[in-house]
């Protein structure tokens, strides 16, 4: 994984938006750069931004959400962090941002917005928090914990690891490398073994508690069940006969009751028909009157229509008179306003003619303002250039004397050559510090390989002997365990053996002979159980010792392989480094050898470069002084020319040039005069528009309308609507008068038609017709009543006949079971209830017997199943017991410590590789007496072994940095790490130790990694030319980067 660029906005003290592109110069050609600035300026904020963009949290602040954000710069409303990174040649962009409501600093925090996109095509791969975190971890192979331990390194943390106690070091190893799974496995094996033993004891207790029926009990219950079954069949037959008789009698009673009800219904229907005769008589006259109803209703409709039309005529006349009066008022007011407006128009025309000169400079103030502003700006620039000229002359006079006499071009060429050779010089220093330590380390490895090979042979012999002993003891344990299990199984059947009687069959095997009962009762399981416990302890101890020995042998084998690989790697590295040395010296055109002292040559190069830089500064200052003089002359000429041009322009308008610093008030006066003239012009245009609006009113509305006696306030804008309303009402008045004539004619015609129909009817006059006339609803009800009465009488008569026939047919089908003629329904129901009760008692007895038989069968099946489960569980207990003896423990310590030891061996091996690259003097190794203790080997002091607590600051830094890089490789074993950021406190190191640390960083840079170091130490600025400078802004509490990193 490689960080390509970083963009951030408003984070902590870094206010504003900034972007650092690590793919561009100067980062592209310099893999080592420093992040410098005073304490508290915000250097670590850059690393916080990287973590925030990728994982939404930082090492200093783990909670950034909608409810809390302490990262956002105060008095701002938004913040963001964006990182572009590369994994396996593919570039991705991780983005995080948050803003406040209404985009105001006091607004509530909103939900953060996140994105993970592919840079090649801009496709968004994830935009939800959980999805983005999971996809980032999948792509990079690093979650937040591994990222902050592999790409963001802090020396202080690993110094704590170096000097920690074994228990603390074990916890740190487990946290950093994820080996906690081994402790969980160890504890799980222990718990599984314990659980299996508990389950076996439960099964054995269940098997001893199962009770079975004797054969005699089973035979007796089976015979009783057969008797009850025969009795049940007889009761069911009797129940069916009794139910049949009860059904026949019940049906006969129902038919007799129904015949009585239907005879009563017939009598009631005849009575209701007799009662309705007066209403039916009125119906005979109402039906002829129905035929005349349409003629009568037509007369009523025409009379109502005529009355409605005449009412409308009256309403329209009233509205027409009112609207015409309103139209006359509107015309009167329009004429009056037109006269007043024309008088105002004449007054405005007079004022505009008198002040016409204001119009001439209506558009000039903007140009005058620009010229006045330019004059002020030029005067300020003139003063600045004069100050810069004085400052440059002072700097030139303060420069130290130099002996070089080169032109500016020659100086630039020489400095460029030094810049090109600087990486080569740094590379030469790194190579010089690597070749000699590698030669010494190679000799040490040869001796170490011989010693480890001899130790490997000895451990193999010891392991083979221990395996033979373990095999013998395991066989003895299996034999004793079989005996103990047999004794335990015999012991669990003690309750059943106590129930055995001579001559009685065994419930399990059926035998009537029990010869071994007394022998079983005389068993003493304690002796074999003691042997079993002793053998289990001995096998467990041999297993643990064998596992430890195997682990030691594996560690020795791996150490041997690592030493051989390291020796081969060192030989290849030595050859490669020698070739690089020759290439570098050839490029520098020097003849130095790897073992020569190169410091005098380096000092001479530095002094020559310093002289060149001083001479370059002198040439640069001389050029600045000439340029400043030219600028001063140019600005003086511009000020004089613009002053003359302004004076000429204002004279043409009869205006005088304002005094210096009074331009704004002078411009304000001119602007007010121009605005005053324009305001009067706008008022004149508005008056003319208003007069034009009144003209159509006066031309359209007639003068013949009579004015109302009392004038009212009118709205002139509605004049057209009022006029159109007058015309519409007049047209409506004429239409209604025509409708009135037609309605009167229709009424006369309807009256004549009714009179003719009345003469042809059964009625003598109109009064007789009205007396017989009924409303349609009443007439329909009477007709429906007559029809209902007739239908009700016929239906009742039919039902009486049908019921009599049904009763006669039922009596012909009397049951043939000897049913007496005098028996009642109650007697049959009583007999049927007795039969039901006997059946219930029979069924209950059968159920009890069947349940006893089923329970006995279930118990026998349960006992057989339990014996099978006991056998299976016994095997599981043995399997888990063996595994528990090897790696199991209650707290998970046994397997965890073994895994942590292997992890520490791997970490020490990787750290030694890093130490060889950084500085060939020191190596790390595990203490033989302590499981997780490490010590330092000083190869320059005859491989003297030292405790890590005795290291100096510089030595501790080198070892801690090697451990940090090794742990980075260990944590990120599936992901290549090409970028490292060291948040290290170099300020506590002395000058000599600081030089050692910087040499180590140079050597690390030569390995191809991009390294960023946070520091505020001045010596860092000289040794690391590429820097990201974080500067405080005095008095504001904010910081900033250089302008090249600002996003505009």
Curated annotation (Swiss-Prot):
Disulfide bonds: none
Gene Ontology molecular functions: 3'-5'-DNA exonuclease activity; ATP binding; ATP hydrolysis activity; DNA exonuclease activity; double-stranded DNA endonuclease activity; single-stranded DNA endodeoxyribonuclease activity
Binding site for ATP: 37-44
GO cellular component: DNA repair complex
GO-annotated biological processes: DNA recombination; DNA repair; DNA replication; DNA replication termination; double-strand break repair
Keyword annotations of the record: ATP-binding, Coiled coil, DNA recombination, DNA replication, Endonuclease, Exonuclease, Hydrolase, Nuclease, Nucleotide-binding
Function: SbcCD cleaves DNA hairpin structures. These structures can inhibit DNA replication and are intermediates in certain DNA recombination reactions. The complex acts as a 3'->5' double strand exonuclease that can open hairpins. It also has a 5' single-strand endonuclease activity.
Family membership noted in the UniProt record: Belongs to the SMC family. SbcC subfamily.
Identification of the protein by name: Nuclease SbcCD subunit C
Gene field: sbcC
């Amino acid at each position: 994984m490689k960080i390509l660029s970083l963009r951030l906005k408003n984070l902590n003290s870094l206010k504003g938006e900034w972007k650092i592109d690590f793919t561009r110069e100067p980062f592209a050609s310099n893999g080592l750069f420093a992040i410098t600035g005073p304490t508290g300026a915000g250097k670590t904020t850059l690393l916080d931004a990287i973590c925030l963009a990728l994982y939404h949290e930082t090492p200093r602040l783990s909670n950034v959400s909608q409810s809390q954000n302490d990262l956002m710069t105060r008095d701002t409303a938004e913040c963001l962090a964006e990182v572009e990174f590369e994994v396996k040649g593919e570039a991705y962009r991780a983005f995080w941002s948050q803003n406040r409501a209404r985009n105001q600093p006091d607004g509530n925090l909103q939900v953060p917005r996140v994105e993970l996109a592919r840079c090649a095509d801009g496709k968004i791969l994830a935009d939800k928090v959980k999805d983005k975190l999971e996809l980032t971890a999948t792509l990079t192979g690093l979650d937040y914990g591994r990222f902050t331990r592999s790409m963001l390194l802090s020396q202080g943390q690993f110094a704590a690891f170096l000097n920690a106690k074994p228990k603390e070091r074990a916890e740190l190893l487990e946290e950093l490398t994820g080996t906690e799974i081994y402790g969980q496995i160890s504890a799980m094996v222990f718990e599984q073994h314990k659980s299996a033993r508990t389950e076996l004891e439960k099964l054995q207790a269940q098997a001893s508690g199962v009770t079975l029926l004797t054969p005699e009990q089973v035979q007796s219950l089976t015979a009783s069940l057969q008797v009850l079954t025969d009795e049940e069949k007889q009761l069911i037959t009797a129940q069916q006969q009794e139910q049949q008789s009860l059904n026949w009698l019940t049906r006969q009673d129902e038919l007799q009751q129904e015949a009585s009800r239907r005879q009563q219904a017939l009598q009631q229907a005849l009575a209701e028909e007799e009662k309705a005769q007066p209403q039916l008589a009125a119906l005979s006259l109402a039906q002829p009157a129905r035929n005349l109803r349409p003629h009568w209703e037509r007369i009523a409709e025409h009379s109502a229509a005529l009355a409605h039309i005449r009412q409308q005529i009256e309403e329209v006349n009233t509205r027409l008179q009112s609207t015409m009066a309103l139209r006359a008022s509107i015309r009167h007011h329009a004429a009056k306003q037109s006269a007043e407006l024309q008088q105002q128009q004449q007054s405005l025309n007079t004022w505009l003619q008198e002040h016409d000169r204001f119009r001439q400079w209506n558009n000039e103030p903007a140009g005058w303002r620009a010229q006045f502003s330019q004059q002020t700006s030029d005067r300020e620039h003139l003063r600045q250039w004069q100050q810069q000229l004085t400052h440059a002359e002072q700097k030139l006079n303060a420069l130290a004397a130099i002996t070089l006499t080169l032109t500016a071009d020659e100086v630039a060429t020489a400095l460029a050559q030094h810049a090109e050779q600087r990486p080569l010089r740094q590379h030469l220093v790194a190579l010089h510090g690597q070749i000699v330590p590698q030669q010494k380390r190679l000799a040490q490895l040869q001796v170490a390989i011989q010693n480890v090979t001899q130790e490997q042979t000895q451990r193999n012999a010891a392991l083979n002997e221990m395996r033979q002993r373990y095999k013998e003891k395991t066989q003895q344990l299996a034999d004793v365990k079989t005996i103990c299990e047999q004794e335990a199984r015999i012991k669990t059947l003690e309750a059943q053996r106590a129930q055995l009687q001579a001559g009685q069959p065994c419930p399990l095997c059926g035998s009537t002979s029990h010869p071994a009962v007394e022998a079983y009762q005389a068993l003493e399981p304690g002796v074999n159980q003691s042997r079993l416990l002793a053998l289990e302890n001995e096998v467990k101890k041999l297993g643990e010792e064998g596992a430890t020995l195997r682990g030691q042998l594996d560690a020795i084998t791996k150490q041997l392989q690592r030493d051989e690989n390291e020796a081969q790697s060192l030989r290849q590295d030595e050859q490669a480094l020698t070739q690089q040395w020759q290439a570098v010296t050839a490029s520098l055109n020097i003849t130095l050898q790897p073992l020569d002292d190169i410091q005098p040559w380096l000092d001479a190069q530095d002094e020559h470069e310093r002289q060149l830089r001083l001479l370059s500064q002198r040439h640069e200052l001389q050029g600045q002084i000439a340029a400043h003089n030219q600028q001063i002359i140019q600005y003086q000429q511009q000020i004089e020319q613009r002053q003359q041009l302004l004076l000429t322009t204002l004279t043409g308008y009869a205006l005088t040039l304002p005094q210096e610093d009074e331009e704004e008030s002078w411009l304000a006066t001119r602007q007010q005069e121009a605005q005053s003239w324009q305001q009067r012009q706008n008022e004149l245009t508005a008056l003319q528009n208003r007069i034009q609006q009144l003209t159509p009113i006066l031309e359209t509305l007639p003068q013949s309308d009579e004015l109302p006696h009392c004038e009212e306030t009118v709205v002139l804008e509605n004049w057209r609507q009022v006029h159109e309303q007058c015309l519409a009402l007049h047209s409506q008045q004429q239409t209604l008068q025509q409708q009135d004539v037609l309605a009167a004619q229709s009424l006369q015609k309807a009256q004549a038609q009714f009179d003719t129909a009345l003469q042809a009817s059964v009625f003598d006059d109109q009064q007789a017709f009205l007396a017989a006339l009924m409303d349609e609803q009443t007439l329909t009800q009477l007709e429906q009543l007559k029809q209902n009465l007739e239908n009700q009488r016929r239906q009742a008569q039919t039902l009486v006949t049908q019921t009599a026939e049904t009763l006669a047919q039922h009596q012909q089908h009397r049951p043939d079971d000897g049913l007496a003629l005098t028996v009642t329904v109650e007697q049959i129901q009583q007999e049927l209830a007795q039969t039901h009760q006997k059946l219930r008692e029979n069924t209950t007895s059968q159920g009890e017997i069947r349940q006893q038989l089923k329970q006995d069968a279930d118990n026998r099946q349960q006992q057989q199943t339990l014996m099978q489960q006991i056998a299976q569980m016994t095997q599981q207990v043995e399997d888990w017991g063996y595994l528990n003896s090897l790696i199991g423990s209650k707290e998970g310590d046994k397997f965890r410590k073994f895994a942590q030891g292997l992890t520490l061996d791997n970490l020490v091996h990787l750290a030694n590789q890093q130490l060889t690259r950084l500085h060939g003097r020191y190596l790390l190794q595990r203490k033989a007496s302590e499981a997780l203790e490490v010590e330092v080997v000083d190869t320059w002091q005859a491989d003297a072994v030292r405790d890590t607590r005795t290291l100096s600051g510089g030595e501790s830094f080198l070892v801690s940095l090697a451990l940090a890089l090794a742990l980075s490789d260990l944590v990120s074993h599936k992901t290549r790490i090409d970028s490292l950021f060291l948040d290290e406190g170099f300020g506590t190191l002395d000058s000599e130790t600081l030089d050692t640390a910087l040499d180590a960083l140079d050597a690390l840079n030569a390995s191809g990694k991009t390294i960023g170091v946070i520091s505020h130490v001045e010596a860092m600025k000289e040794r690391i030319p590429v820097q990201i400078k974080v500067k405080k802004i005095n008095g504001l509490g904010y910081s900033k980067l250089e302008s090249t990193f600002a996003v505009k």
